[in-house]
Amino acid sequence: MRFAQLIAMAAAWLAPCTALGADSTPASASDDRIALSANGSTLPGTNGGGGASVAWLHNFDADTLAGVAVEHQVISVAHWTFGSVNGSLTRELGDARYSFYGEAHEGAGDNGAHAFKYSIVAAGLIGTYFHRLSVQLEDRQFDVITTHGNLPKLGLSYLWNPHTLTTVSYADTVGGNLGTHLTSGRIDLSGSQLNFLAGVSFGQVSPTVLNLNISLPGKTLKEGYVGVTKLLPHLRGALTLVVDYQDLSGSNRVAVTVNYIFHFGHQGKPT
């Protein structure tokens, strides 16, 4: 799932304002976490799919994060495995905060007809102003099977209060054959023990962007998802459940993802 990437998993667990670089500091300057994820999905005309991942996330200090992961996914007759590295660096400039981030996912798989290479890399910048407004610029490059191209994205987020964050974004293909023009919206609600999220996406999209590495007849997407995170202070972790519904030109997919993130080795505390 697109929102279950490593940095997104951490962001779903931490308070939304922290994830966007607002005026907040992690409880521990140096911290280590393990992120475990499993998912299952349905897809008409197939036996569905599923997958799992394990990741290590490390905060070198309050503003520097890095992580590595390995993931395996199956959908219909296709399967693929890849490793990931990611990192982010945040710096203050006057009253603004800027977070630079990058990620790379490299691996291989087989779709039943032939073996294929799996490569997705991305880099981006998030600027936060007035402790409330964030602007995101990102470019994501795809090279999977015969699909390739760049997908720049512009996103705007606004922190209405310490517990409510809204985000809208637009991504459009540049070069290659992605053929993607995607509009998205999301809301995050955070509480003392529970965090909630919900979002929608619609537009033209390549199945590869949805992590569907099989041939599908249509490219018109209507998507909605909801999720909840339960903070587990006594276990120094958090559990997230996300349910995602996708309608890709009449081909309906339902996916359920469970993430568990926990601290180890240091005395950091969940936000």
Predicted regions and their residues:
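Short glycine/proline- and aromatic-enriched beta-strand/turn motifs that initiate or cap beta-hairpins
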Residues: G21-S76
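Transmembrane beta-barrel strands of outer-membrane/channel proteins
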Residues: L36-G40, V68-H72, G102-E106, A123, ...
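Repeated loop/turn-to-beta-strand initiation elements of outer-membrane beta-barrel proteins
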Residues: D32-I34, F60-V68, E92-G102, F130-L137, ...
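Outer-membrane beta-barrel "beta-signal"
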Residues: I187-L194, V226, N252-T271
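Cleavable N-terminal export/targeting peptides
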Residues: M1-D31, F264-T271
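Solvent-exposed loop/turn segments connecting transmembrane beta-strands
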Residues: S41-G50, Q73-G83, E106-S119, Q141-N150, ...
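Outer membrane beta-barrel transmembrane domains
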Residues: L182-D244
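Outer-membrane beta-barrel architecture
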Residues: A35-S37, A55, N86-T90, G124-I126, ...
